UniProtKB/Swiss-Prot annotation:
Chemical reaction(s) catalysed: (8S)-3',8-cyclo-7,8-dihydroguanosine 5'-triphosphate = cyclic pyranopterin phosphate + diphosphate
Function description: Catalyzes the conversion of (8S)-3',8-cyclo-7,8-dihydroguanosine 5'-triphosphate to cyclic pyranopterin monophosphate (cPMP).
Known pathway: Cofactor biosynthesis; molybdopterin biosynthesis
Similarity field: Belongs to the MoaC family.
Keyword Lyase annotated: yes
PANTHER family on file: CYCLIC PYRANOPTERIN MONOPHOSPHATE SYNTHASE, MOLYBDOPTERIN COFACTOR SYNTHESIS PROTEIN A
Name by which UniProt lists this protein: Cyclic pyranopterin monophosphate synthase
GO-annotated biological processes: Mo-molybdopterin cofactor biosynthetic process
MF GO annotations: cyclic pyranopterin monophosphate synthase activity
SUPFAM superfamilies per UniProt: Molybdenum cofactor biosynthesis protein C, MoaC
Species name: Thermomicrobium roseum (strain ATCC 27502 / DSM 5159 / P-2)
Length: 166
């Protein structure tokens, strides 16, 4: 198992020193979903939610969240993001909204947390916008799908869970 880099020799939490690492192009993709009732999904699809365009607002919320990750996750480095894409789409078969975020930077550390935060906040935004009509919504399957760049290279999730999260 890999060493926990956010702990010092005494086991105390610390922000990792990345000063000596080279700047490289980094990419991370994360996914998640919000399961809801069929009639709630229909409201979203038809643009009839009382609070407005759920898909557009969730997209923007995810982008904003990626940019503010270091303010939310205590040991994350503030990063100069070069690209953030958040896609929110309806899935009629599974009665859910699927969320995917792709985040890029040229930096000394990865953007996995930014991608995961984008998905989580987009999902929470969906819940906030629709809770008046469907308090039973479920947010789940928030996971890293892929990361590239840096010393550890490329990693991709290859299990069934990732395929089902699409």
């Amino acid at each position: 198992m890999a060493e926990l880099t956010h702990l010092d020799e005494r086991g105390q939490a610390r922000m990792v020193d990345v000063a000596e690492k080279p700047e490289t192009h980094r990419v991370a993709v994360a996914r998640g979903r919000v399961s809801l009732r069929p009639e709630t999904l229909q409201l979203v699809r038809e643009g009839r939610a009382a609070k407005g365009d759920v898909l557009a607002v969730a997209r923007v919320a995810g982008i904003m969240a990626a940019k503010r990750t270091a303010e939310l996750i205590p040991l994350c480095h503030p990063l100069p993001l070069t690209k953030v894409e958040v896609d929110v789409r309806t899935n009629e078969q599974d009665t859910c909204l699927e969320i995917e975020a792709r985040v890029e930077t040229v930096s000394r550390t990865g953007v996995e947390m930014e991608a995961l935060t984008a998905v989580a906040v987009a999902a929470l935004t969906v819940y906030d916008m629709l809770k008046a009509v469907d308090r039973g919504m479920t947010i789940d399957r928030i996971q890293l799908i892929e990361k590239a760049g840096g010393r550890s290279g490329t990693w991709r999730r290859e299990d069934d869970e990732a395929r089902h999260a699409r």
